[in-house]
Amino acid sequence: MKILAKWLTLVVLLCTTPAKAALDIVITEGVDAARPIAVMPFQWQGAGAPPQAIADVVMSDLVRSGTFKPLDELGLPQRGIGALAQFDANAWTNVSAEALVVGSVKPYGADQFLVSFELIDLVKAQNQALKGSANPTELLMDSRQTVISATQFRQYGHRISDIVYEKLTGIRGAFLTRISYVVVNHSQKAAYSLMIADYDGYNEQMLLRSPEPLMSPAWSPDGRRLAYVSFENKKAEIFVQDLYTQVRTKVSSFSGINGAPSFSPDGKSLAVTLSKDGQPEIYVIDIATKAIKRITNHYSIDTEPSWYPDGKSLLFTSERGGRPQLYRVDLNSGKVTRETFEGEWNLGGSITPDGRSMIFVNRTNGKFNIARMDLSTRFMQVLTSTRLDESPSVAPNGTMVIYGTTHQGKQVLAAVSTDGRFKARLPAGQGEVKSPSWSPFL
């Protein structure tokens, strides 16, 4: 309970604005193929109305995962139940869903609420009903009870979604993560805003506003800091900003290009692109000491570095073969290996957290789309069919990619599952949105 309370406090520190969605989520493909699941509205055991409907958050999360499809509550049997003790397996024999989420909320002191939830195995329940047996304890896949405040309903809903997702898929849920992005609104004097929001667009927070471009936000592995490029001083500079204290540090301000920061897996260094010695090359900067090490040395452009999960290699984009392609450089030996060959261009790559795949922008027949390549088989799959796709960023559980694209003449964010089945757009209410970056687990 103490660990969860500490986690909820950290989340609230980051969520400093009212709970509203700055980015809409418009699902465009993939819901029909998702796995059916039942989510019952949580029983409210108090006067008036609860501060927020937790079940709505859970259902939205599961839909947006691309993996699950919550059934219409109006068609469910036993509407209104809030615990396994009220569950009747015989009533669920004709429901095509693998699990049921039930729960309750009741006041628990001043501005405190006790939230209980249970995950029930419907497949086992249906088997028990067919056999005429009854063993409720075998049906319980998970059960939690937590005291939260009125401001923590949405965050705890994401926590429940994480638990449900992991229990049913074996993959850690990423609903308690955040995204950073740049909003551009040329109707304002300070047209560029660096923003952070929950993964679903709620609880937006502005880190910086500037009349000059902001770009390339990148999260530290602990989720406490953000690196980005700012032109606020009329030149490209790289900053690292603490998201809790708001203190920021200038890491790189050389002449020419200072761009594409990427945190090392241990959070101590940044891989960056600098042109201080002539052509754009890849460097690694120690954040604490500012010590700098040159990694590549080639007459062609080298840019967009990202780290392999083990921290021993970098993936980067280079034109050394004549056109932009992705290369790997071993940080110990300096050996460079070309990684991509299909299509006209391949750029802006990163390695998935499990180290098994590469996500990048592929250009084929003049079209820029997000693609995935299996690093063992080298099989490449184009994931998107949107226009002018760029800046892909992978969720920390490796199941989804957020990226920038163009829709109806405007820059927007979009998301696609790493198997290509689920697709969604994330348009902003005002301005254009670009340069997304998905946080680590928080």
From Swiss-Prot:
For this chain, the family text in UniProt reads:
Belongs to the TolB family.
**Physiological role:** Part of the Tol-Pal system, which plays a role in outer membrane invagination during cell division and is important for maintaining outer membrane integrity.
| Coiled-coil features, chain-numbered ranges | none
Q: What domain of life is recorded for the organism?
A: Bacteria
Q: Which gene encodes it?
A: tolB
GO CC term, one of those recorded: periplasmic space
Q: What is this protein called?
A: Tol-Pal system protein TolB
InterPro entries membership: 6-blade_b-propeller_TolB-like, PD40, Tol-Pal_TolB, TolB_N
Record's subunit section: The Tol-Pal system is composed of five core proteins: the inner membrane proteins TolA, TolQ and TolR, the periplasmic protein TolB and the outer membrane protein Pal. They form a network linking the inner and outer membranes and the peptidoglycan layer.
What is an annotated GO biological process for this record, any one? Answer: protein import
Cite the entry's keywords alphabetically: Cell cycle, Cell division, Periplasm, Signal
Its localization reads:
Periplasm
Q: Which interval of the chain is the signal sequence?
A: 1-21
Query: Record's Gene3D superfamilies?
Result: TolB, C-terminal domain, TolB, N-terminal domain
* A Pfam family of this chain: PD40
